[in-house]
Structure formats: C-alpha cells, structure tokens
C-alpha cells in the first residue's frame, strides 16, 4: 500500500471491540471493512448467531412468547441464516443445537434493565460504541452484563495452570470489561459479574468482576488502537476457514480472490 498514510481516517474513527478484533484477526480485513468501507456479504456462522440474538431480543422485548421461539426458529431458519453453507452434518448440528436451547429455554436470572442496549463511551481519548445484549439487576441492585455467544465456551477450570479454554474465556471477557466502562460512566458503579449465555452448548458462565482485568482490558484497547494508528501496511492473515466462512469482505479481498483462482486451476 506504499507510503500512503491512513492515519487521518483512523484518527476520526469511533471504536468498538469488534473493530479492534477485526484488526487483530486480519489487518487487511480491517482495511477493507473500515477504511475502504466495503459492505459485508452474509455468512452462515455470523447470521446464525445474529438469528438467535434476534429471537432472544424479541422475547425480552415482549414481541415473542417463550412457546413461540422454537417454532419461529424452525420456520425462519432458511430465510434468516444466509451465506455459503458448510457441509450438511454441520448445518444439522447447528439446527439441533438451536432446537435444544430453545426447547429448554429459561429466562436469565436477573431483572432486565435493557436488551441490546446501545452504549457510547470513552476509553482514554478514544470514542467507543457497543451493544450490550442484556443488562440485568439482582434484588440487591447489583448489575450484570450478559453476552449471548454462539461460541462453545467453558466455565473456568480454576486449575493452577490455565487451560486453553481458560485463555479463550479471558480473551472473550475483554469485550465485557470494555462494555463495563460504559456502565461505570452511565451508572457510576461497576457490574457485579460478567456472564456468557453460550446458546449452542447450553452453558451459562458467570465470572465475578475483576478490577485488575478491567484495567488490563482498557489498556489492551488503548494499546491496540495505537498499534492500528501506526500501521502502514495492512497485511492479510490467510487462513482458509476464516477467509471462506467467516470474513464478510472476502469477495473484495485480492488475496482470497487469487487463492480461489489458484484452487480452480488445480
């Protein structure tokens, strides 16, 4: 990309956890999506997650009854879950997981303050925006952030040496710690706990709020943005599954286009 600096565009950005993670996953995807501003195409896995999110949002807003959720899931699956399908056994596994979750669905154990709550806040000198899936409160006035996840996370093992799943959980928790900045700025208090509703495996994870991890997550966000600001060459991180099934801008990616043409030639 030569000596052209995109810093003026980056300096004007409003940040989010997903924007930072796009860069960490593939700098070139960040470039295509947030600098070139290409529209994303539908992908199976992301649209599946969005569909479940939508069903839960409609339930908590009173637009969908509990007994209607499973029927709506089955009737609208083909319309709502779009993009290139993986192999049929994988599609069926996702359908079965959705059915299992909705058949045994239980509302969250905290009174709802808001669902899909839009938050605008600041970390250091940087503007942020986010959407909290569910903000709840218990009988003592403690706040809880709940994030709906299609990823199959596991509760913390509490082993002396963290497991791979523990490290994955800590990585995912950064998002909720960043959202906690918005809660502190709006309500003047921090959440009591951060929770993941893992709807594919039916696991509900509750993590007590850790102030050290909170500060570390804020610093991670600032350091990540500074790294992006200093980036001149947004290089691609090529990985077939992610490029083909996850990346929403792969139709505009010269590296993915070249790779597909190479596969066709062979």
Can you annotate each of these PLM segments?
Residues 20-62, 116, 249:
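Nuclease catalytic cores
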Residues 44, 48, 94, 172-175, ...:
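Hydrophobic (often cysteine-bearing) scaffold residues that line and stabilize catalytic clefts
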Residues 117-176, 180:
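Non-catalytic protein-protein interaction segments used by genome-maintenance enzymes to assemble
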Residues 26, 52-53, 134, 179, ...:
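A residue-level signal for conserved active-site and pocket-lining positions in enzyme catalytic cores
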Residues 54-117:
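A non-catalytic, helix-rich entry segment at domain boundaries
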Residues 78, 82, 169, 173, ...:
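Metal-dependent nuclease catalytic regions and adjoining charged, substrate-binding loops involved
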Residues 36, 149-152, 198-200, 211:
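A short beta-strand motif that forms part of the nucleic acid-binding face
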